[in-house]
Amino acid sequence: MIKTTIIASIKDLIKDAVKDKFKITIDLNDFVVDKAKSIEFGDFYSNVAMILASKLKKNPILIAEEICEYLKNHKTNLFESTEAVKPGYINVFLSNSVKSDLFKQINKDKDTYGIFEPKKVAYNIEFVSANPTGSLHIGHARNAALGQTLGNVWKAYGYTIEQEYYINDGGNQINNLGMSVFYRYLQKCGKDVQMEEDFYQGSEPIAVAELIYKEHKDKFVNVKYSATKIEDEKVFDFFRDFSKTELMNIIKKDLKDFSVHFDRYFPESKIYEMKLVDPTIKKLGKYVYEKDGALWLKTTEFGDDKDRVIVKSDKSFTYFMPDIAYHDIKATRTINGLKTDKIFNIWGADHASYVDRMTVALQCLGFKKDIMHVIVMQMVKLTKNGKEFKMSKRSGNSLTLRDLINAIGVDNSRWELISQAAESHIEIDVEKFTSADSTSNLSYVLYAYSRIQKILEKNESLLKESKSYNTDLLTNLKEKDMIAMLFYYPQTIANIAKSYEVHKIPIFLYTLANLLHSYYSEVKIIDESNKELLIQRLHLLQCVNQVIKNGLKLLDIEAKVLNK
């Protein structure tokens, strides 16, 4: 397991150097150590001297030189050398010793390379949370991919994670679903009835109605009903609850097939069954007041543009109130014995305006402002032959998660939905995956994995007889660059755990694959005239493939050998 990253180790040494040379303490977050943009200038670099220049009133290049002098005089197996370059950067060249240790660690850890020691940090992340009124559409697919991948990264970083799906079953939409299924059932029984305009027109109500008909035949054909309600409450409840359960079963199956799982499904109806709203109102205390027969929440106390109604004058709750109660439940839970440090939501851009309102509500409950973080994602567009599919559940024209899987497969879907920042719009061109001469970014990465795997298989006996992991002959710049990338993999996980930018996993993997393909094209890897060099290269390739495999696993994509 990873205790610390190479960057953290370099930062600690630089911090010690600053304290020794300049008698001041610098915060680790105040300066950068990162992978060098070009391997010619070192494996890593730091801007610490330029950060200190104004404080020390000194030329940054002179500061950098003094830090390099400290690092040179204090023996460490980390560095081959360091150099100060204008205007004040410090370039770091890693030693062969630490590179050899890296190869040993990767080959020892294998699938767990990049997994950190457990930390006492617990997060709840709620995502997807689609109304159980139809199949998940491709917007939900992106939400699911983001949430699951972020959960995977946090777990790899050592956090305790609870993944949650909120079932919105408390509103009128579920009643409409039940009536939609009832009308389809009547049609199945031979009745000439027309669906109401706000009913769900998709295939799911038809499928559920057929299940009911198969079990009960025409048992309910003569019940009395209006446009929006079945008079017999038990029959109405049956159609509503049965429909909700069946739709949730469809959703759960699609999520499972998409490699997405949840630790908890929490229905909104449970909030009412357990009478959790009134205690939440009481907890809001002084921030609740009555006006015009309604209860208002004084959200303006925390910067909202206006106060919000939480209980209407007819004593019914606004949709805001059960949401407040639900977020209170999440924020006060323990997760595997740990208090919840932060709650996360992934919402579509159409809910962006709701973020500040919910943040303020949690402050009214006594939580810190940063108890909740919301990742707002943009929509997804699927095109084929230049035409866009439109989405509307009620009209039955929704492009579903299942459609996406059928069109381009689970692995391609997961990659494409993660490969851009959440705030960016995504357009997926189906032709890219169905045309024989097209290459997707995922296939490019898998092709790199495949190339390496075939080389390793052909040289399996040579690898087995080698007991050491030397790196002194790996002097090619692309070899050095790949080694630096291997060092950087755990840091990538650490960065994403704090920035939530999961699209940086595909970027990392594509960059590593690109290096491999370039190396493969330019270098005669299998050079049998130099056995030691060949062994070192094989060990490098072995490590590269392990990191590709581990990185893909964070996306729930299996590393597999392509046949081309």
From Swiss-Prot:
<dbReference type="InterPro" id="IPR005148">
    <property type="entry name" value="Arg-tRNA-synth_N"/>
</dbReference>
<keyword id="KW-0963">Cytoplasm</keyword>
<dbReference type="InterPro" id="IPR008909">
    <property type="entry name" value="DALR_anticod-bd"/>
</dbReference>
<keyword id="KW-0436">Ligase</keyword>
<dbReference type="Pfam" id="PF05746">
    <property type="entry name" value="DALR_1"/>
</dbReference>
<dbReference type="InterPro" id="IPR036695">
    <property type="entry name" value="Arg-tRNA-synth_N_sf"/>
</dbReference>
<dbReference type="GO" id="GO:0005524">
    <property type="term" value="F:ATP binding"/>
</dbReference>
<protein>
    <recommendedName>
        <fullName>Arginine--tRNA ligase</fullName>
        <ecNumber>6.1.1.19</ecNumber>
    </recommendedName>
</protein>
<dbReference type="InterPro" id="IPR001278">
    <property type="entry name" value="Arg-tRNA-ligase"/>
</dbReference>
<dbReference type="InterPro" id="IPR009080">
    <property type="entry name" value="tRNAsynth_Ia_anticodon-bd"/>
</dbReference>
<dbReference type="InterPro" id="IPR001412">
    <property type="entry name" value="aa-tRNA-synth_I_CS"/>
</dbReference>
<dbReference type="Pfam" id="PF03485">
    <property type="entry name" value="Arg_tRNA_synt_N"/>
</dbReference>
<dbReference type="GO" id="GO:0004814">
    <property type="term" value="F:arginine-tRNA ligase activity"/>
</dbReference>
<keyword id="KW-0067">ATP-binding</keyword>
<keyword id="KW-0547">Nucleotide-binding</keyword>
<dbReference type="Pfam" id="PF00750">
    <property type="entry name" value="tRNA-synt_1d"/>
</dbReference>
<feature type="short sequence motif" description="'HIGH' region">
    <location>
        <begin position="130"/>
        <end position="140"/>
    </location>
</feature>
<keyword id="KW-0648">Protein biosynthesis</keyword>
<comment type="similarity">
    <text>Belongs to the class-I aminoacyl-tRNA synthetase family.</text>
</comment>
<dbReference type="GO" id="GO:0005737">
    <property type="term" value="C:cytoplasm"/>
</dbReference>
<comment type="subunit">
    <text>Monomer.</text>
</comment>
<keyword id="KW-0030">Aminoacyl-tRNA synthetase</keyword>
<dbReference type="GO" id="GO:0006420">
    <property type="term" value="P:arginyl-tRNA aminoacylation"/>
</dbReference>
<dbReference type="InterPro" id="IPR035684">
    <property type="entry name" value="ArgRS_core"/>
</dbReference>
<dbReference type="InterPro" id="IPR014729">
    <property type="entry name" value="Rossmann-like_a/b/a_fold"/>
</dbReference>
